[in-house]
Amino acid sequence: ADDELTLRTSTTWLQGIERELRRRLYQWRHLPVDMIMDDYIACPKVVHSTGLGISEDVDIRVTDQNSDIYSRQFHQQIACLQDVDKIKTPVVTYDREATEQARHVMAGIFGDILPVRVTGLKGKWFAPWDELIRWFGVEQAMTDLIDRPELVHSAMTRLMDAKLAELDQWQALGLLDRNDDNTRIGSGGYGYTTDLPGINLNPKQVRTENMW
């Protein structure tokens, strides 16, 4: 890429900002197609979650050292109905101070080049089955759908209840943001539409009904 994507910053946080900008500029120069550029730099709200209480136990096999895509073998962690209790309901917190610190630093970097805008959650990718197989293993999950459907249904119900509770917390804490804009929706479309945000919009308290 003729050094266009080479990072110059040193900290992980700044590298994340630089990487996004370099990729955006690279696409604009070489592959613009119907690309849209925002007229601001987004400073995401700093949000913490305790998570689901269970994470994948996995063996990996790397075939390309330059790629973050690799083969995985998941070890089963939900093998009986009692194991479903391992799935916990996340507790969400908003770190307002850390968000303001990040905004201040970014404003100092970009100055009058681009305004910095604090943004909330414009959407989170969530594929329930993709999450579940990390705890069952792909083959075991498919087998259990036939041999022990009550186990899979129980785990899926628990997972969905937990994620919906997390979504409710995002909304209650004012963390959601409109995504009827230059936001990737689903598998790749822009969020622009005249049907959103709808008539019941409070700009300071965006609700799920105002979003994709």
Can you name each region flagged by the protein language model?
Residues 76-85, 135-139:
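Residues forming anionic-ligand binding surfaces in small-molecule and nucleic-acid pockets
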Residues 1-4, 34-36, 47, 90-212:
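Active-site loop segments of alpha/beta catalytic cores
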Residues 1-82, 101, 108-125, 165:
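N-terminal basic, low-complexity leaders that serve as flexible interaction/assembly modules and, when applicable
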Residues 67, 71, 84, 187-189, ...:
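Generic intrinsically disordered, low-complexity segments enriched for polar/acidic and small residues
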